[in-house]
């Protein structure tokens, strides 16, 4: 669905095609929502978030704010007033500037922390879901697993040929992500740690996560590329990604594959938490939204969308 890639949500398109809910990346709640907002849209939380988390925060938002009384364009636009899909860096900037009251993102980069500090804004982080950071290569690449040490060597430039890690005698084509993106922040902080990365070539930094994946898949005839992203984005995000999945594979790390079971039990090495971030003293309506997401009903939505919940999902919500 194009709504996944749009800068903001096509609420009208969604409203007129409820049967296509799945293609818009939205998931129904089980049972009646335990939280409902009033008709006073000015008090609703303003929810911004990264692309990979869109199916989560949009599904919740549309179930918790009132349905428009009229199906005219104005009512529909007001309902989408508080929802904006963006990139991680822009979501943080929106929170710092005050246009967003809660954002759904990965952990902040050093640059984002510094900008908040300079603006005199203290941020509050609430983890609510678990996610894996994964490495993708062409489906024909003979390498199926890398050690953490080998990953560092490849992305620092110390290892530049696949045959050094059990692959073909080919130069490794390393793909990076832009600074301040959620993926690059995790790559530097969790994976590389104190090891400097290769300088990113301009041609290999792709702005959209989907773009990175498309580029890796394009190299199937010379299977020499490696890139990184989030597990959910490449396995569940939308139809285009699923088509690409037939041309790429996810590498095991230290022999442990990034399956949902291994994410849940913590054996896969590169696990990250997804966060809701607010200012230090959020509005009461924003705090209710955050609290709902870590409640049993909110955690059930996390699980139903395809992420791994951090807390217990609702045991009594097995019925619709």
Q: PLM features: what roles do these ranges have?
A:
Residues 1-131, 136-320:
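Exported/periplasmic ABC-transporter solute-binding proteins
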């Amino acid at each position: 669905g194009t709504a996944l890639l749009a800068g903001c949500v096509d609420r009208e398109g969604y409203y007129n095609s409820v049967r296509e809910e799945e293609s818009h990346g939205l998931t129904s709640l089980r049972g009646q929502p335990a939280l409902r907002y009033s008709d006073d849209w000015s008090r609703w939380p303003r929810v911004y978030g990264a692309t990979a988390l869109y199916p989560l925060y949009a599904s919740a938002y549309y179930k918790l704010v009132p349905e428009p009384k009229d199906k005219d364009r104005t009512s529909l636009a007001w309902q989408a007033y508080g929802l904006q899909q963006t990139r991680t860096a822009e979501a943080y900037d929106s929170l710092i500037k005050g246009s967003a009251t809660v954002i759904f993102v990965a952990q902040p980069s050093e640059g984002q922390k510094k900008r908040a500090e300079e603006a005199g804004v203290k941020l509050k982080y609430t983890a609510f879901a678990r996610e894996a950071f994964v490495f993708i290569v062409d489906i024909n690449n003979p390498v199926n697993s890398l050690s953490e040490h080998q990953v560092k060597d490849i992305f620092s430039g110390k290892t530049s040929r696949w045959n050094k890690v059990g692959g073909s005698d080919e130069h490794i084509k390393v793909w990076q992500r832009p600074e301040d993106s959620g993926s690059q922040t995790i790559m530097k902080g969790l994976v590389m740690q104190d090891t400097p990365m290769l300088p990113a070539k301009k041609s290999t930094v792709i702005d959209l996560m989907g773009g990175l994946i498309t580029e890796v898949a394009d190299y199937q005839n010379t299977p020499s590329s490696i890139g990184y992203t989030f597990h959910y984005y490449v396995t569940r995000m939308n139809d285009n990604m699923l088509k690409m999945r037939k041309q790429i594979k996810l590498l095991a790390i230290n022999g442990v594959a990034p399956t949902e079971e291994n994410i849940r039990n913590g054996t896969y090495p590169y696990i990250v938490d997804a966060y809701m971030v607010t200012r230090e003293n959020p509005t009461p309506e924003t705090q209710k939204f955050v609290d709902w997401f870590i409640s049993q009903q909110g955690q059930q939505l996390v699980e139903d969308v395809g992420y791994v919940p951090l807390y217990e999902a609702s045991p009594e919500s097995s019925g619709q």
